[in-house]
Amino acid sequence: MNVVILDTGCANLNSVKSAIARHGYEPKVSRDPDVVLLADKLFLPGVGTAQAAMDQVRERELFDLIKACTQPVLGICLGMQLLGRRSEESNGVDLLGIIDEDVPKMTDFGLPLPHMGWNRVYPQAGNRLFQGIEDGAYFYFVHSYAMPVNPWTIAQCNYGEPFTAAVQKDNFYGVQFHPERSGAAGAKLLKNFLEM
């Protein structure tokens, strides 16, 4: 199977690459349209700010390429947020617009931001991405912005208030947490995605 990690220039790709390799796949890191469009599975990781990430997406001519993908795509952390419409970061950043939902800064409710560490995730019953993962399994988060619960939410988490922990629209999936740093539950989620 042809597994590709999209080279957005704004992610530490080694941990994602290693996590995929543990399932027996050899992922390529690429931004070449011919490689990306022929992938069976595509990963969209991201760390840092939405502004820097979208600058890289545009500079590397990935905006239309990502939106043209028809194979399963998994956005991770900031990669999930990039699927949204607009981020509140940096006075507002236009995102890919695949999911018609904004990404506001989290309200702290007296809790520290960023939301960092392990938290429980509650998936919708029956979604293939969470098959075999128990309700309330712990995943690892590091973020200060979060997509609200919306019609495309497939899993929720609570940090002062509910937010989207995972999302799906058509072939595009996103997870706010880091599956590659989430132990057995994260490994199972990656396996589920790779075997779709």
Swiss-Prot record:
The keyword rRNA processing does not apply. It comes from Escherichia coli (strain K12). Optimum pH is 6-8. It is found in: Cytoplasm. Pathway: Amino-acid biosynthesis; L-histidine biosynthesis; L-histidine from 5-phospho-alpha-D-ribose 1-diphosphate: step 5/9. GO terms for molecular function: glutaminase activity; imidazoleglycerol-phosphate synthase activity; lyase activity. Pfam families: GATase. This is Imidazole glycerol phosphate synthase subunit HisH. Residues 2-196 form the Glutamine amidotransferase type-1 domain. The gene is hisH. IGPS catalyzes the conversion of PRFAR and glutamine to IGP, AICAR and glutamate. The HisH subunit catalyzes the hydrolysis of glutamine to glutamate and ammonia as part of the synthesis of IGP and AICAR. The resulting ammonia molecule is channeled to the active site of HisF. The active site is at residues 77, 178, 180.
